[in-house]
Amino acid sequence: MSLTQEDKAGIISQFGGVQQNTGKAEVQVALFSRRITDLTGHLQQHPKDKHSRRGLLMLVGKRKKVLNYLKNVDIERYRTVIAELDLRK
């Protein structure tokens, strides 16, 4: 299932503060995480879908890059994002 405009707006307002703040690292990580969750569910139902698996791996890589940037720039923002999205233990 793709991300609807309402879902995307909710994620942006939750992590970015205002609707126009889509470039914030926290917003990008949250949107990537939501898309990764949706693709993971799709791949559980369709295990032979190799194209979607590649897209999933690309999204995971993008999220990893943004998280590394956030960790290097501001460790506290990184920790709050990790805690809110429940990404790492």
Curated annotation (Swiss-Prot):
GO molecular-function terms, A-Z: rRNA binding; structural constituent of ribosome
Keywords of this entry: Ribonucleoprotein, Ribosomal protein, RNA-binding, rRNA-binding
Domain of life: Bacteria
GO cellular component labels: cytosolic small ribosomal subunit
Matching InterPro entries: Ribosomal_uS15 (IPR000589), Ribosomal_uS15_bac-type (IPR005290), uS15_NS1_RNA-bd_sf (IPR009068)
Entry-linked CDD domains: Ribosomal_S15p_S13e (cd00353)
One Pfam short name: Ribosomal_S15
Gene Ontology biological-process entries: translation
Subunit structure: Part of the 30S ribosomal subunit. Forms a bridge to the 50S subunit in the 70S ribosome, contacting the 23S rRNA.
Family named by the database record: Belongs to the universal ribosomal protein uS15 family.
Protein's job: One of the primary rRNA binding proteins, it binds directly to 16S rRNA where it helps nucleate assembly of the platform of the 30S subunit by binding and bridging several RNA helices of the 16S rRNA.
PANTHER family: RIBOSOMAL PROTEIN S15, BACTERIAL AND ORGANELLAR, SMALL RIBOSOMAL SUBUNIT PROTEIN US15M
HAMAP family xref list: Ribosomal_uS15_B (MF_01343_B)
Protein name per its UniProtKB record: Small ribosomal subunit protein uS15
